[in-house]
Regions:
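Accessory "access/gating" subregions that flank catalytic or transport cores
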Residues: 36-79, 237, 250, 262-263, ...
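Hydrophobic alpha-helical positions that pack around
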Residues: 139-265, 277
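Well-ordered alpha-helical segments embedded in enzymatic catalytic cores
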Residues: 110-114, 247, 336-339
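Iron-sulfur-cluster electron-transfer modules
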Residues: 1-193
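Ferredoxin-type iron-sulfur electron-transfer modules in oxidoreductases and energy-metabolism complexes
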Residues: 33-52, 76, 82-84, 90, ...
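Short amphipathic, charge-patterned alpha-helical segments
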Residues: 114-118, 265-282
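Active/binding-pocket-proximal capping segment
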Residues: 267, 279-280, 288-294, 343, ...
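Flexible loop/turn segments at secondary-structure boundaries
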Residues: 65, 93-96, 134-139, 176-179, ...
Length: 442
C-alpha cells in the first residue's frame, strides 16, 4: 500500500535479539540511560516532562499518565505525609488482549526502568508489579530482570548516588479477571478478595494500605524511558495532537500474520492488515474489535477509522487495549459474542446486582439462541438486560459485557433473527476454525 503509515518499533525494536530479556542486551540498546537522565532532574521535572509528552494510559481508558501522577499529594501533612506507592497493573486477562505479556517476556527491563523513573517522580519507595498468575514464564523473566536491576544498583538503596531508595516487588495474582480493575487489584494486593472499591476516595489519595497510590498499565510505564531518553518533541512527532506517540497493536484471529505491530496512534486497520498480510486467504473481513472483547465491535466499513482515542470513539467504540481481533465471514457473530458473555458471567465478582444477575441471564439467552430454543423476544431481552447493566454496574466489567452485545445486534440483527427462524446456528463452526499449517513448529 503506497503512502501507508510506517511502523515505529520502540518497545519491540530488539525482540528478535537472541536474549532480548537480559540486562546485557538492554544495556546495549541504551538501557537505563533514561534513568540517569531522570535522576539528574527533580521529581517534579520528570513529572512535568511526562505531562508535556501527552502520554496517555495504555490500559484502556487513555487517561493522561503525567496528570495521574500529579494527583499524588505532595508535602508533609495529611495524606501527603503517608508513604506513596506505585502499582503496575500487569493482570492482562481479557479475551484478545495480548500486548503486555510479550512485552514483559521479551523486554522486561523496559518495565523495570520505567517503574524506577515513575516511582522517583511520585516519590514512592515501593513499587508493586501485579502479574497474572497463570503466566509463569513471564513471572520468572520479570523476577529475573528485577534481580538483575538490584545487582546493578538500579534498584535498592541510594540509587545512582541520588539518595533515592526503591524496592520492587513482583506479585503473582490468582487468576481473577476482576483484579484488572485497579481498586480490586489493590484489595488483592492487600490479601483480600478482589472486588472494586467505592470511589471516592480515589487511589491517588487512599489506595494501597490507604496511602496515595498510582496504578498504571505495563505499556504506559514501559513507554516512559524512551520519552526521557529521546525527548518530548520526538514522542509528540508520532500520533495525533490529542493522542501522541507510539503503541502496540495486537492483531489476532483470521489474519495472515497475527502478532504485535508497534505503530503511531492514528494508524488504520486497513494499514495494519496490509502489514499483516491481510485477512486469511480466500476470505473477507466481517467484524473486528478495536480494543478487546469489552469494546463495541466494528465492521469493514470502519477500516479507515484512525486507531486513536478520538477516532475510535467517534466511530462508536473504544480503543481500549488495542486488541484487534479479526473475524471473517465464516464466523457466527452470535456465537462469538455468546462466548465473550460466558467469560464475563464467569468472571463477575458478584458485588453488584446488575452485573451478577445480568450476565447470568445474558449467558442463558445466548445458550437458547445457539441450541434452537430462542425466540424473537430474546433478542429484545438481550438489549433490555444490556441496558440495565451498561453504566449501572459498580465497575466497568458490566459495561464490557454489554458493549459487544448492543453493537452486534446493531450491525448483525439479521443473524440473530436467523438463529430464531432456523432454530439454531446456521454457521458451521469448523469453517471459522484456525488450523496450523502442515509442518508448523509447535
Amino acid at each position: 500500500m503506497a503512502g501507508r503509515t510506517p511502523l515505529t518499533p520502540v518497545l519491540s525494536r530488539f525482540w528478535d535479539d537472541p536474549k532480548s530479556w537480559t540486562f546485557e542486551t538492554y544495556r546495549e540498546h541504551d538501557g537505563y540511560r533514561a534513568l540517569a537522565t531522570a535522576l539528574n532532574m527533580t521529581p517534579d521535572e520528570v513529572l512535568q516532562t511526562v505531562k508535556e509528552s501527552g502520554l496517555r494510559g495504555r490500559g484502556g481508558a487513555g487517561f493522561g499518565t503525567g496528570m495521574k501522577w500529579g494527583f499524588i499529594p505532595q508535602g508533609g501533612t495529611g495524606p501527603a505525609a503517608k508513604p506513596h506507592y506505585l502499582v503496575i497493573n500487569a493482570d492482562e486477562s481479557e479475551p484478545g488482549t495480548c500486548k503486555d505479556i510479550p512485552l514483559m517476556f521479551m523486554t522486561p527491563h523496559f518495565l523495570v526502568e520505567g517503574a524506577i523513573i515513575a516511582a522517583y517522580a511520585i516519590r514512592a519507595s515501593h513499587a508493586f508489579i501485579y502479574v497474572r498468575g497463570e503466566v509463569v514464564p513471564v513471572l520468572r523473566r520479570l523476577r529475573g530482570a528485577v534481580a538483575e536491576a538490584y545487582e546493578a544498583g538500579y534498584v535498592g538503596r541510594d540509587i545512582g548516588g541520588s539518595g533515592f531508595d526503591l524496592d520492587i516487588i513482583v506479585h503473582a495474582g490468582a487468576g481473577a479477571y476482576i483484579c484488572g480493575e485497579e481498586t480490586a487489584l489493590l484489595d488483592s494486593l492487600e490479601g483480600r478478595r478482589g472486588q472494586p472499591r467505592l470511589r471516592p476516595p480515589f487511589p491517588a489519595v487512599s489506595g494501597l494500605y490507604a496511602c496515595p497510590t498510582v496504578v498504571n498499565n505495563v505499556e504506559s510505564i514501559a513507554s516512559v524511558p524512551p520519552i526521557l531518553l529521546n525527548g518530548v518533541d520526538w514522542f509528540r512527532s508520532m500520533g495525533s495532537d490529542k493522542s501522541p506517540g507510539f503503541t502496540l497493536y495486537s492483531l489476532s484471529g483470521h489474519v495472515t500474520r497475527p502478532g504485535q505491530y508497534e505503530a503511531p496512534l492514528g494508524i488504520t486497520l486497513r494499514e495494519l492488515l496490509d502489514y499483516a498480510g491481510g485477512v486469511r486467504a480466500g476470505h473477507q473481513l466481517k467484524f473486528w474489535t478495536p480494543g478487546g472483547s469489552s469494546t463495541p465491535i466494528l465492521t469493514a466499513e470502519h477500516l479507515d477509522v484512525p486507531l486513536d482515542y478520538e477516532g475510535v470513539g467517534a466511530a462508536g467504540s473504544m480503543l481500549g487495549t488495542k486488541a484487534l481481533q479479526i473475524f471473517d465471514e465464516t464466523t457466527c457473530v452470535v456465537r462469538a459474542v455468546g462466548r465473550w458473555t460466558q467469560f464475563y458471567e464467569h468472571e463477575s465478582c458478584g458485588k453488584c446486582t446488575p452485573c451478577r444477575e445480568g450476565t447470568y441471564w445474558l449467558a442463558q439467552i445466548y445458550d437458547r439462541l445457539e441450541t434452537g430454543d430462542g425466540t424473537s423476544a430474546d433478542i429484545d431481552k438481550l438489549l433490555d438486560i444490556s441496558d440495565t447493566i451498561n453504566g449501572k454496574s459498580f465497575c466497568a466489567l458490566g459495561d464490557g459485557a454489554a458493549s459487544p452485545i448492543i453493537s452486534s445486534i446493531k450491525y448483525f440483527r439479521d443473524e440473530y433473527v436467523a438463529h430464531v427462524e432456523q432454530q439454531g446456528c446456521p454457521f458451521d463452526p469448523r469453517d471459522s476454525m484456525l488450523v496450523a499449517p502442515e509442518g508448523a513448529a509447535v
